[in-house]
Curated annotation (Swiss-Prot):
<comment type="similarity">
    <text>Belongs to the cytochrome b family.</text>
</comment>
<feature type="transmembrane region" description="Helical">
    <location>
        <begin position="77"/>
        <end position="98"/>
    </location>
</feature>
<dbReference type="InterPro" id="IPR030689">
    <property type="entry name" value="Cytochrome_b"/>
</dbReference>
<dbReference type="InterPro" id="IPR005797">
    <property type="entry name" value="Cyt_b/b6_N"/>
</dbReference>
<keyword id="KW-0408">Iron</keyword>
<keyword id="KW-1133">Transmembrane helix</keyword>
<keyword id="KW-0496">Mitochondrion</keyword>
<feature type="transmembrane region" description="Helical">
    <location>
        <begin position="113"/>
        <end position="133"/>
    </location>
</feature>
<keyword id="KW-0813">Transport</keyword>
<feature type="transmembrane region" description="Helical">
    <location>
        <begin position="347"/>
        <end position="367"/>
    </location>
</feature>
<comment type="function">
    <text>Component of the ubiquinol-cytochrome c reductase complex (complex III or cytochrome b-c1 complex) that is part of the mitochondrial respiratory chain. The b-c1 complex mediates electron transfer from ubiquinol to cytochrome c. Contributes to the generation of a proton gradient across the mitochondrial membrane that is then used for ATP synthesis.</text>
</comment>
<feature type="binding site" description="axial binding residue">
    <location>
        <position position="83"/>
    </location>
    <ligand>
        <name>heme b b562</name>
    </ligand>
</feature>
<protein>
    <recommendedName>
        <fullName>Cytochrome b</fullName>
    </recommendedName>
</protein>
<keyword id="KW-0249">Electron transport</keyword>
<feature type="transmembrane region" description="Helical">
    <location>
        <begin position="33"/>
        <end position="53"/>
    </location>
</feature>
<feature type="transmembrane region" description="Helical">
    <location>
        <begin position="288"/>
        <end position="308"/>
    </location>
</feature>
<feature type="transmembrane region" description="Helical">
    <location>
        <begin position="320"/>
        <end position="340"/>
    </location>
</feature>
Amino acid sequence: MKILRKNHPLFKIINHSFIDLPTPSNISSWWNFGSLLGMCLMIQILTGLFLAMHYTSDTTTAFSSVAHICRDVNYGWLIRYLHANGASMFFICLFIHVGRGIYYGSYVLSETWNIGIILFLTTMATAFVGYVLPWGQMSFWGATVITNLLSAIPYIGSTLVEWIWGGFSVDKATLTRFFAFHFILPFIITAFVLVHLLFLHETGSNNPSGLNSNSDKIPFHPYYTIKDLLGILFLLTALMILALFFPDILGDPDNYTPANPLNTPAHIKPEWYFLFAYAILRSIPNKLGGVLALLLSILILMAFPLLNTSKQHGLIFRPITQTIYWILIANLLVLTWIGGQPVEYPFTMIGQIASITYFAIILILMPVSNTIENNIIKL
């Protein structure tokens, strides 16, 4: 068996990636979230596949087909709620994974980091088109509002929106193509994940100390496979509690009303994991400016390798930048809260302050604190 896994052309790749992979001996539980994301992706693809067997992407039957899945299909309700809440678990793991990357300076591995950001954007696109599929009120109006933002693009905006809609409004053509996108994108994500791992294994993993760990590495199996299995057990427990006891806690009650183009909901808002970006979008009065800010709120992550001037790797020994980092996390939580609030005073003002602070922390405060800490080291 040992000879086979080391010499067989296919098993050799798996062996070098998951069994004999030299791994730093000191990586903490914050490094578990990569494997948890892989687990989430597998859950989403499997549950999504079973849902697609019963779902119909037609405006007249989409809503009733989801109701049929929940009522008439064997364990259809469980598959549906695992898929819906699995998306939330996916994004929780994704946010922690990115947050850990920023805290421990993993962005210095720029190829891995940039592929990760492309993965983040692709996952957001997949979640957005997926949210439209049940064809409830919030699905329909969310699709209308978000796709309509593209009309802010000069010259080609209106044409682009109609091209995406497949007509002059969100209708049957839109739903059909969104279902097609939602089906294909997870497989594209899987391909990107393999590229992400390829780049990661080229350089080796980062570690909490930020020091070179080449002199102190251990094989991935059995040490980290056991550790990852424990993380997966916790994730599955949390997901089952969410899906079985609180299946609708993260959803919107408006989505239990069939889509009606003649009746606009009082507050149009996306799923909770998009609220921080939605708050940034809403805080800018200009439509094009809002769309650019929305894009930059994610793409700004690509600036981390360029803005990093610190002599030290990660924030573990850098108290000033550490404090700024936690202010950034608090700021993102405020933005998430604001995104779910109505567009009125004082929420608009808080949103504008939090949006400015978000960009200021990343573009100004963090590079300044890097320079200050570099000078302190010289003393």
